């Protein structure tokens, strides 16, 4: 089965057939923030696509032929071409498909977006550390790290004097960093943006975007997934289905 809410494919499953002409396939996982980047771009650009969910706790053998790292997201087109690594898949979609351009044409503005992505780059690993941390001392130290990283992003918005990181409308960089901010509430980390008012306004503006709101995961589902994921349960990726 394919689709956003289809159960994931695991070890022993048969590989899906060829991608139909005129479509593109994303190998994804419903709760993965890296895969969400690519799903946001697919939705924002209105690209016809199918979704194959992968069980990351029980990966199918054939999936390593799609991506030697065994990670999502992976894109596969009807020519059998494979593209992986989330930021690369997003740039590919923007260049390969018509419609709204999410990356700026201007080389300097494009470079600015990539530099902001570098400024953000510690946040995903901090989220991973926070999820796995076991004691209050770890929590306190990690929360301080989050505040430091968010201050850097606050400075970008302050200097730009715009609502979004690429200007006055949503662009690629906003979609690339959003999935981790979406999860702050579920992880009880909202207080880490209390000192960054412009970042809080950006988060509120992002939730108003039709693409973002269509792909939001409820706090309950995210916490349910996380509980099973930390137990290494193969059922984690299908939580709520």
Curated annotation (Swiss-Prot):
It catalyses: RX + glutathione = an S-substituted glutathione + a halide anion + H(+); L-dehydroascorbate + 2 glutathione = glutathione disulfide + L-ascorbate; methylarsonate + 2 glutathione + H(+) = methylarsonous acid + glutathione disulfide + H2O. One of its GO terms (molecular function) is glutathione transferase activity. Residues 106-230 form the GST C-terminal domain. GO terms for cellular component: cytoplasm; cytosol; extracellular exosome. Keywords: Acetylation, Cytoplasm, Oxidoreductase, Phosphoprotein, Transferase. PROSITE patterns: GST_CTER, GST_NTER. It comes from the Eukaryota. The modification N-acetylserine is found at residue 2. The active site is at residue 32. Glutathione binds at residues 59, 72, 85-86. GO terms for biological process: cellular response to arsenic-containing substance; glutathione metabolic process; L-ascorbic acid metabolic process; negative regulation of release of sequestered calcium ion into cytosol; positive regulation of release of sequestered calcium ion into cytosol; positive regulation of skeletal muscle contraction by regulation of release of sequestered calcium ion; regulation of cardiac muscle contraction by regulation of the release of sequestered calcium ion; regulation of release of sequestered calcium ion into cytosol by sarcoplasmic reticulum. The modification N6-acetyllysine is found at residues 57, 143, 148, 152. Signal peptide: none annotated. Pfam families: GST_C_3, GST_N_2. Optimum pH is 8. It is found in: Cytoplasm, Cytosol. Homodimer. Belongs to the GST superfamily. Omega family. This is Glutathione S-transferase omega-1. The gene is GSTO1.
């Amino acid at each position: 089965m394919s689709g956003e809410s289809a159960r994931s494919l695991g070890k022993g499953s048969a590989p899906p057939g060829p991608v139909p002409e005129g479509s593109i396939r994303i190998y994804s996982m419903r709760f993965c923030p890296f895969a969400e980047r690519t799903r946001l771009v697919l939705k924002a650009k209105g690209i016809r696509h199918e979704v194959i969910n992968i069980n990351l706790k029980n990966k199918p053998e054939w999936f390593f032929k799609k991506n030697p790292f065994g990670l999502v997201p992976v894109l596969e087109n009807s020519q059998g071409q494979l593209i992986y690594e989330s930021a690369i898949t997003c740039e590919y979609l923007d260049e390969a498909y018509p419609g709204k351009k999410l990356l700026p044409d201007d080389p300097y503005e494009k470079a600015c977006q990539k530099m902001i992505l570098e400024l953000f780059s510690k946040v995903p690993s901090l989220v991973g550390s926070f999820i796995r941390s076991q004691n209050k001392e770890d929590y306190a130290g990690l929360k301080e790290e989050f505040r430091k990283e968010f201050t850097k992003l606050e400075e970008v918005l302050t200097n730009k004097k715009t609502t979004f990181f690429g200007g006055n409308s949503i662009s690629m960089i906003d979609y690339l960093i959003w999935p981790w901010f979406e999860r702050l509430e579920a992880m009880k980390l909202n207080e880490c943006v209390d000192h960054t008012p412009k970042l809080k306004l950006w988060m509120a503006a992002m939730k108003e975007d039709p693409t973002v709101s269509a792909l939001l995961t409820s706090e309950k589902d995210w916490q349910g997934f996380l509980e099973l994921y930390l137990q290494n349960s193969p059922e984690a990726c299908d939580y709520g289905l």
